[in-house]
């Protein structure tokens, strides 16, 4: 087996799934008794979620509803970075959550060090917002996948282009 095998480690969020989860969460918020008459809303602005509600307690409830819907749609909630709760217009509070797409340099270094610690015959390359792993043995590549899945990374990762 002279041919090398490879796969890419990426961190992606499917934006259509996020939109679907927001729509389902908004329907639930409109129908829930404890949200009657409140100004609760969820908006998607490019790659940022904006949560708006009357007070911090209701904002946390909106966040819980949204997270439950995101989980049902298989959207990784590890990739949501929440900002501070801030006051908004009309006696409401707002919180922004950025959707992290891609693997940044720090997390790429963590992934690289996890792979190096395995001491397998594989090579890694950081390419923009993904990490490519190549090796001659498919068993080594599967061991790398298992090690990265078991590692406690601050972002959710997917494995694509397994060749």
Curated annotation (Swiss-Prot):
NCBIfam families: PRK05412.1. Nucleotide-binding protein. InterPro entries: DUF520, UPF0234-like_C, UPF0234_N, YajQ-like_sf. GO terms for cellular component: cytosol. Transmembrane segments: none annotated. This is Nucleotide-binding protein Bcer98_0876. Belongs to the YajQ family.
């Amino acid at each position: 087996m002279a041919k090398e095998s490879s796969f890419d480690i990426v961190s992606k969020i499917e934006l259509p799934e996020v939109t679907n989860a927001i729509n389902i969460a908004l329907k639930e918020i409109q129908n829930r008794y404890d949200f009657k008459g409140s100004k609760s809303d969820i908006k998607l602005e490019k790659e940022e979620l904006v949560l708006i509600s009357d007070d911090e307690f209701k904002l946390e409830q909106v966040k819980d509803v949204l997270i439950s819907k995101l989980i049902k749609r298989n959207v990784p909630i590890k990739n949501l970075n929440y900002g501070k709760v801030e006051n908004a217009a009309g006696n409401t509070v707002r919180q922004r959550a950025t959707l992290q797409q891609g693997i940044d340099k720090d997390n790429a270094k963590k992934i690289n060090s996890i792979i190096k610690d395995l001491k397998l015959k594989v090579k890694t390359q950081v390419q923009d917002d993904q990490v490519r792993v190549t090796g001659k043995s498919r068993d080594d590549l599967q061991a790398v996948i298992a090690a990265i899945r078991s590692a406690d990374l601050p972002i959710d990762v997917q494995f694509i282009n397994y060749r």
